[in-house]
Amino acid sequence: MVTNKMTAAFRNPSGKQVATDKVAEKLSSTLSWVKNTVSHTVSQMASQVASPSTSLHTTSSSTTLSTPALSPSSPSQLSPDDLELLAKLEEQNRLLETDSKSLRSVNGSRRNSGSSLVSSSSASSNLSHLEEDSWILWGRIVNEWEDVRKKKEKQVKELVHKGIPHHFRAIVWQLLCSAQSMPIKDQYSELLKMTSPCEKLIRRDIARTYPEHNFFKEKDSLGQEVLFNVMKAYSLVDREVGYCQGSAFIVGLLLMQMPEEEAFCVFVKLMQDYRLRELFKPSMAELGLCMYQFECMIQEHLPELFVHFQSQSFHTSMYASSWFLTIFLTTFPLPIATRIFDIFMSEGLEIVFRVGLALLQMNQAELMQLDMEGMLQHFQKVIPHQFDGVPDKLIQAAYQVKYNSKKMKKLEKEYTTIKTKEMEEQVEIKRLRTENRLLKQRIETLEKHKCSSNYNEDFVLQLEKELVQARLSEAESQCALKEMQDKVLDIEKRNNSLPDENNIARLQEELIAVKLREAEAIMGLKELRQQVKDLEEHWQRHLARTTGRWKDPPKKNAMNELQDELMTIRLREAETQAEIREIKQRMMEMETQNQINSNHLRRAEQEVISLQEKVQYLSAQNKGLLTQLSEAKRKQAEIECKNKEEVMAVRLREADSIAAVAELRQHIAELEIQKEEGKLQGQLNKSDSNQYIGELKDQIAELNHELRCLKGQRGFSGQPPFDGIHIVNHLIGDDESFHSSDEDFIDNSLQETGVGFPLHGKSGSMSLDPAVADGSESETEDSVLETRESNQVVQKERPPRRRESYSTTV
């Protein structure tokens, strides 16, 4: 069923219409093929229900069922026999509708025959409003397939998920796989005339394909014949694949929907574009890949079920191989399998993975409780009938499965890598087996040759040849021995010239290797000596046998002499080989020592090179560090200069500030002194000396208090009695009399503002003396001014001044 939204998306403005002209053209070819297929089935059913009032006609264009004597609107007027006959006809109509091929024929005849009351009643009961909408919708999709496929592909997929209407399935399948106009369709008739090597296999398996379906169950029926034709034609087109049993079910489903030529084209397209060709190859490599991917999906989504399958040795191929080979056609009934095949035509093998995993998810609880045989029975008997009548439930469950195409590609690469390694191992095993077989054959040949060798008349000639060869080999051995001796001497000289190695561990390892070689050489030497000893014993026995035979004929004596000489030569050859073996052993020892020394030299050279590189690296690093150090020193000097400049600037600013503060304080002191002088002069003029002295003492006490506040010191105790005022100012003209410290200068400036108390400092002193009674007011003012000038300290130098003394007595 389709929704109103999808129906509106494809509905044309003219309203409902059953089918367009293009759909009718597509259906005409299908209906022409249906008539021959259904004719014998319809005739059999017609013979069972034939009566004067009912007739069954089979024509070249359609199959028509009519009951002119019956009226569905007046059932009460019919006799019991007529009612029974009508019931049988309705039953036969239902049977025809369940047949996928007969349904198309009957519906086509109903559209062409408006006079059949049975057809009209069946059509009115089976076609609902939604089915008519589906017909209109799919008719429009088929007419405008190219535009719809490009612009509304997603909506088309959703409609396919809901199911393709039966009458449009043949056309839509051809459109989905693009099999409408294939050149191979013209070759079909020629292929049928040819002979295929797979004909016997196809004939044998045809009876097993849909054995319960009416179209294929009878031997040599039309269905089996067209199935044989399609399978034979494809086996000739693709000789590598030939014929595979599972492919017959797919072809059979196609033949239920369309004529054999169109079914052949669709099948060729499926094999080429839907991975079916790789599935049906003799190696079935693609089937192994699908099994691996499906097993990985089970392991990811259903780990508990996967573990249960592994514990029961229930392999994936035991139940899922037929799913991929037949697209569930041998698993589910045809209505459900056809729905799955609709989606397969649209989306490919993805639907097989989805449906398979959905089946396992829905049956996980039951499968977990069964053993291997029980699970096989469950897959064969229970699962196929779980969704009878509810195929939408299975489709919905399938599309709830998580399917990751990128992960499937990754699994495909992993499977390819695994198979490549297996192929390499198989090739290696095959090569080893072949080599083993050849060696066995060679051993057998040598054993046969050894057993069949006998003394004959040519033995003497053979001995002479062997004697010549032995002499030649002896001469070659002597030359080789001399060369080896020269080589040994050369190696000894080079060995003596090489420096010793102090690495004890490496020497011990090499010594062990040399001792092993020496032991092997000693064993070989012992074997040679044993051989020489055996030859000598053999020679002695031979001499013992031949001592009493001097009377033998000359020919035999000559042969004996040759044998003796040959034995002697063999003894010499054995001795020579022993010497060569010893020389080779010495040469091997020398070469070993040479190799050891070469290794030592190479390691020493490598160490020297590495040390040189390290020295170069360290020198470069040292240069870089020196450069960084010089740069750091330069930056440090610059920073120090800047700091000094900043300190000097700060000190200059501080000196200026201190000088300004001193000047201000000195100016304040001058003003206060002038004020006090004015007050003192006024009071001297108005009051007597005793009263003034008391007031003056009070003022002096206040000034002392202010001075202590300014200096943060305690007031002086024990003031001398004042009978008069004596102000003395001593000025020292030396430069040393001035303090360099700004704080001392400030303290002195503050002390100089006091009157009548001792002032301690280097620049001068001020005291109150009661004995001093003479003086004038002008002299007092001059002394104060001189005191102020003497205590002004600035940064520039002043010339030395004379010492002056002023006294004022009241």
Curated annotation (Swiss-Prot):
Span list, region Disordered: 49-80, 98-123, 756-810
Region feature Targeting to the centrosomes, mapped onto this chain: 377-810
Biased amino acid composition, Basic and acidic residues: 785-810
Top-rank taxon: Eukaryota
Residues of the site described as Breakpoint for translocation to form EVI5-TRNG10 fusion protein: N594
One Gene Ontology biological process: cell division
InterPro entries per the UniProt record, alphabetical: Rab-GAP-TBC_dom (IPR000195), Rab-GAP_TBC_sf (IPR035969), Rab_GAP_TBC_domain (IPR050302)
Pfam families: RabGAP-TBC
Region (Interaction with AURKB and INCENP): 487-810
Every Rab-GAP TBC domain range: 163-348
GO cellular component, one term: cytosol
Keywords: Cell cycle, Cell division, Chromosomal rearrangement, Coiled coil, Cytoplasm, Cytoskeleton, Nucleus, Phosphoprotein, Ubl conjugation
Region (Interaction with alpha-tubulin, gamma-tubulin, BIRC5 and FBXO5): 1-483
Subcellular location, principal: nucleus
PTM characteristics: Probably phosphorylated by PLK1; may be required for degradation during mitosis.
Modified residues (Phosphoserine): S102, S113, S497, S689, S776, S778
Reported tissue expression: Expressed in various cell lines (at protein level). Expressed in a wide range of tissues including brain and adrenal.
GO MF assignments: GTPase activator activity; small GTPase binding
Region Dimerization, residue ranges: 128-693
Coiled-coil portions: 406-716
Annotated function: Functions as a regulator of cell cycle progression by stabilizing the FBXO5 protein and promoting cyclin-A accumulation during interphase. May play a role in cytokinesis.
PANTHER family: EVI5-LIKE PROTEIN ISOFORM X1, RAB GTPASE-ACTIVATING PROTEIN 1-LIKE
Oligomer and partners: Dimeric and monomeric. Interacts with alpha- and gamma-tubulin. Interacts with FBXO5. Interacts with the chromosome passenger complex (CPC) which is at least composed of AURKB/aurora-B, BIRC5/survivin, CDCA8/borealin and INCENP.
Involvement in disease: A chromosomal aberration involving EVI5 is found is a patient with stage 4S neuroblastoma. Translocation t(1;10)(p22;q21) that forms a EVI5-TRNG10 fusion protein. TRNG10 is a probable structural transcript which is normally not translated.
Note: Depletion of EVI5 by RNAi causes cell cycle arrest and mitotic abnormalities.
Protein name: Ecotropic viral integration site 5 protein homolog
Natural source organism: Homo sapiens
